[in-house]
Amino acid sequence: MNPLYLASGSPRRRELLTQIGVPFTAISADIDETPLADESPAAYVERLARGKAAAGRGLITSSESQAPACVLGADTAVVLDGRILGKPLDQADALQMLMALSGREHEVFTAIALLDGERCESRVVRSLVRFRPISPAEAALYWASGEPCDKAGGYAIQGLAAVFVAGLNGSYSAVVGLPVCETAELLGHFGIPCWQNLPVR
């Protein structure tokens, strides 16, 4: 079986991949995440997921892997009114994002890409998240927690921001950062089964 590498520094993605029982090695693959002119959110996250997988594959030396390695890349974007909300630059940016999301529905696009050196397959998952109204005081308190700093859209659905979520249509795990169902399907296409750590009965 081909060894699997996760080209991501995200603890959330590592947890989700561990959850489906797939052994992997995490590597960091930094790429330029600047959106291209007139690039749709779906095309943007797919390009970045593929780029991260390719960058990760470039970091693996032949001595590290006797079998051809598979590299999984992923990217998530929060989108409001067609505009991609990245990671907040500072407190003012984070508070502005939270107040813009307050009481409204927004889109979350997450892409995954799996590359083995010969082929690359990818998937894009779109989810809708609806926030209840958020007061400026709540937004400031949430910022002070430190949680929004490195999150797309300035919030973590699996963390303290769960109290803001009034509804979700789509994949919860995709909003967190890795669509588990689609990831398992893609891994299967490359001969990597899930639940490898289950005890034999």
UniProtKB/Swiss-Prot annotation:
Report keywords, A-Z: Cytoplasm, Hydrolase, Nucleotide metabolism
* Molecular function via GO: dTTP diphosphatase activity; UTP diphosphatase activity
Broad EC category: hydrolase
**Site for Important for substrate specificity, residues:** R12, T76, Q158
Its Enzyme Commission number(s) read: 3.6.1.9
Do you know which InterPro entries this protein is assigned to? ITPase-like_fam (IPR029001), Maf-like (IPR003697)
As for subcellular location, the record says: Cytoplasm
Catalytic reaction equation(s): dTTP + H2O = dTMP + diphosphate + H(+); UTP + H2O = UMP + diphosphate + H(+)
An example of a Gene Ontology cellular component annotation for this protein is: cytoplasm
Name the residues annotated as catalytic in the UniProt entry. Answer: D75
Q: State where it is primarily located.
A: cytoplasm
Q: Which cofactor does it need?
A: a divalent metal cation
Q: Which domain of life is it from?
A: Bacteria
BP terms from Gene Ontology: nucleotide metabolic process
Q: Which family does it belong to?
A: Belongs to the Maf family. YhdE subfamily.
Instruction: Write down the NCBIfam families for this protein, in alphabetical order.
Output: maf
Q: What does this protein do?
A: Nucleoside triphosphate pyrophosphatase that hydrolyzes dTTP and UTP. May have a dual role in cell division arrest and in preventing the incorporation of modified nucleotides into cellular nucleic acids.
Q: What is this protein called?
A: dTTP/UTP pyrophosphatase
Which species does the entry assign this protein to? Pseudomonas fluorescens (strain ATCC BAA-477 / NRRL B-23932 / Pf-5)
Organism ancestry: Bacteria, Pseudomonadati, Pseudomonadota, Gammaproteobacteria, Pseudomonadales
